[in-house]
Amino acid sequence: MNIKPKPILYYIYDPMCSWCWGYRPTWLLLQKNIESLVQINTMVGGLAEDSNVPMPETTQHFLQQTWHKISAELGTQFNFDFWSQCQPKRSTYPSCRAVIIARQHQKEQAMCLAIQEAYYLHAQNPSEVSTLIKLAEDIGLDGGLFAQQINSEKLKQQLTNEIIKVRSLPIQGFPSLVLAVDGELFPIRLDYKNWQTSYDMILATLNSVANK
């Protein structure tokens, strides 16, 4: 008798994606309620490549407006001091590599939360490797080893491979959910305010596949 592999729910995000920060409370509830039915695999999508170039004023303005929009719609907390106290850069690949390192130590969620809180609540810049090293130490990782790994060619290739896989999935942005069942991929509707919406769609999809 062949035992079918457990369905996989992919959660695709970027630790510096403001909508992912807004979705976090709902995602935690969905995880809690769905983890007995599916295997949860997290993947980083990489919003912005490595760059030391200061973020253009127009992009800064757009992102601040996005923060205001998310705060108004979802009640998400943001500390706007970031925009006056830090030099913003449009660069999220370093933070994506940071969570890949943490994943290897079963600390991906802790690192993601540390990056999000640093960025959105404490006006710290996760585009800076020095910030990421401090956060790594805060969650119990070896700061020296982390510093060696964060910009290594091996880790950069790991991120590239992950981004290639993410781009092959049926998604249109971050955060996104995709259910993999019996070799088929199903995009799952993501509701920022209610975990039950995605949960019901996952159950319906699983039942539909089972009854084929």
Regions inferred by a protein language model and the residue ranges of each:
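A generic fold-level signal
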Residues: K4, Y93, I171-Q172
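Extreme N-terminal starter segment of soluble prokaryotic enzymes
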Residues: K4-Y10
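C-terminal cap of thioredoxin/glutaredoxin-like
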Residues: Y11-I12, M16, Y23-K32, E117-K212
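Structural alpha/beta surface segment adjacent to cysteine/selenocysteine redox centers
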Residues: W21-H122
